[in-house]
Amino acid sequence: MRNKYCILILLTVLSLSWKQKNNMKSNERIVYALDVTIPGRYEAYINDILVETNNEMSMHNTIININQAVLKSGTYQFRIKLFSSNEELRKGGIQPDTFQFLKVGLVKYQKIAVGEGAEEGTYQYLYSYPIPNLEKPVPYYEIKGKFTIDLPYELNGWSNGQDLRKWDKDTLKKKVIAYYKKLWEILNKGDVDQWQKLVKKSQEEIAFFNYSDKEYLNKYIKEEKEEIIKDKGMMAALEDYEMKIYADGRLVCLERSNHTKQVNGIDWDIKGESPLIQYGKEGGAATFPVKLYLPQ
């Protein structure tokens, strides 16, 4: 079990809110995404936020949701970083012929009412980003692009957060680590009521941009509570992390800093994942991706 979207938590006041556009239509469930084919390991950033990381050296054909990293309509940027395998590095890096498989496109669709996916006949391929022709191997490569979107809603989210880049780095890191330790203790105790107090508003915003109804949200919350209680006392040690700042200084988090081959009996490289990891009593693990911000 892995959480799909990142939970946003304040370091101080624990509240979030959203505001709808006056012209929002009840039947609009517009999703923007990057439709990608990526050969090898990669990290995907949208609006200066790491939204997806995959450490498997294989061919990835996937959709990267844009809605999760933006708060309203506008023009934004993305970047996708491709990394060499150890074998490729011995040959100088990513080989030029590998780039023939790399594809990145902007898509838009109307989400189905229940679950994930596009309503039939609504999937639009808006733009295909150019891929370079390289003449020699490179240790890594980064493709960047811009896109403009028009969403039927507007969220407050982290928009009023402080620019944490202006903080003393050591002071900020101590504060962030202390807060993660607090979250770790809550999860390890199986204190689902306290956890819900912290994440309720963020879960509501996730449900909102994902066009999920209250029934779906309540079902998700119920299942998460059951998982936390079932694996009470099974939190992995809070270790091997580094602090990362995103969203032009508005968001901060801890991420695992080293590669792994296995986690609690399953093949899983957790570099870049949240260090809040709960082991399953019957094997496997769940991460709790959290980003923090401080209101101005």
Model-derived regions: residue spans:
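Positively charged n-region of N-terminal signal peptides that target proteins for export
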Residues: 1-5
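Exposed low-complexity, polar/acidic, P/S/T/G-rich flexible segments that act as propeptides
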Residues: 88-125
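Beta-strand-rich ligand-recognition modules
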Residues: 26-29, 37-101
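Juxtamembrane and targeting peptides
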Residues: 120-168
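Exposed beta-sheet edge and beta->alpha loop/turn motif
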Residues: 231-296
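Short solvent-exposed beta->alpha transition segments
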Residues: 196-250
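Short, aromatic-enriched amphipathic alpha-helices that serve as compact interaction elements
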Residues: 172-190
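Bacterial Sec-dependent signal peptides at the C-terminal "C-region" and cleavage site
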Residues: 6, 10-26
